[in-house]
Amino acid sequence: MCIRDRDRKLLLLKPQTYMNESGVAVKKVKDFFKISSNQTIVIYDDLDLQVGQIKIKDTGGSGGHNGVNSIIENIGNNNFIRIRIGIGKPLEKSMTNKYVLSKFTKDESKIVNNINNLAKNIIYSIVFKSISFAMNTFNSKIQ
């Protein structure tokens, strides 16, 4: 999906690859549209944040997230903006794979729906204001 506003064009991409191969899709789109890494925003789930917590970063490592690791490996750097959305973590580490593929509870679904509605404001803030503004406005707030 492409969104235009003023002189800027925003391209929204949801890779149809497996999560741990997300980097293949991101690289193809970046190369085709000649998008630099610092103009790339990646939104992903994060086990290390509570459900509904948001953390925006302008660079960094994968934090053990296979999808982010794939992006770093495929594009050759880690200079892209990240919007991490908390999903909490299971009580037992051995249940992680099952946990990330499971459905949210009713209460969690309400929180996640609020995040989905908030996402456009976060992206708008990053693109049309600044990454600093977005981080100060949205980081660490449980929605």
What are these regions (language model features)?
Residues 4-58, 69, 73, 77-83, ...:
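Nucleotide and nucleotide-moiety/phosphate-recognizing core
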Residues 61:
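Short-chain dehydrogenase/reductase
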Residues 64-67:
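Hydrophobic alpha-helical segments within soluble ligand-binding/sensing domains
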Residues 104-107:
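A hydrophobic, small-residue-rich beta->alpha segment in the mid-to-C-terminal subdomain
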